[in-house]
Structure formats: structure tokens, C-alpha cells
Amino acid sequence: MSKQDAIEIEGTVTESLPNAMFRVDLDNGFNVLAHISGKIRRNYIKILPGDRVKVELTPYDLTKGRITYRLRKK
């Protein structure tokens, strides 16, 4: 799967799970299980419940994703 095939959508973190996994409610109403990307892990960016994030989904499995960006608070 190439990067162009990935679906990128915004959502809100609702639950923090073990092993850097998170439950995310997407803006379209779906709920996905997401892990954090390597750059977020390497730069020690903290993700807490209530944070707005960008999630990358594959077209093959729309129930799992990767958190690629934490959006700034307004």
C-alpha cells in the first residue's frame, strides 16, 4: 500500500489503551482503534483523551488506523 492510498481523517481521542493504542471517534461518526506513528513516538509527543488528531486509515481495514498528527488546541 502506498501513501497515496491512505485515507486521512480527523477525530477525537476518547480512550487511552495499553501499548500506545487509542480509541478514536472520527468526525464521520465511526470509531477506530489507532496506534501512534514512529515520528510521534520518537519526539515524545503526548496524546491524551480529548485531543484532536489526524488518523490515517488503509482502504483494506477501516477499523484500525495510525495517528499521524496531534492538532493544536484552540
Swiss-Prot record:
Similarity section: Belongs to the IF-1 family.
Signal peptide: none
Role: One of the essential components for the initiation of protein synthesis. Stabilizes the binding of IF-2 and IF-3 on the 30S subunit to which N-formylmethionyl-tRNA(fMet) subsequently binds. Helps modulate mRNA selection, yielding the 30S pre-initiation complex (PIC). Upon addition of the 50S ribosomal subunit IF-1, IF-2 and IF-3 are released leaving the mature 70S translation initiation complex.
Quaternary structure and interacting proteins, as annotated: Component of the 30S ribosomal translation pre-initiation complex which assembles on the 30S ribosome in the order IF-2 and IF-3, IF-1 and N-formylmethionyl-tRNA(fMet); mRNA recruitment can occur at any time during PIC assembly.
Residues covered by the S1-like domain: 1-72
Chief place of localization: cytoplasm
GO molecular function, one term: ribosome binding
GO cellular component, one term: cytosol
Cysteines engaged in disulfide bonds, as pairs: none
Lineage: Bacteria, Bacillati, Cyanobacteriota, Cyanophyceae, Acaryochloridales
Pfam family, one: eIF-1a
UniProt keyword Transmembrane present: no
SMART domains: S1 (SM00316)
Keywords: Cytoplasm, Initiation factor, Protein biosynthesis, RNA-binding, rRNA-binding
Gene field: infA
Compartments (UniProt record): Cytoplasm
Protein name: Translation initiation factor IF-1
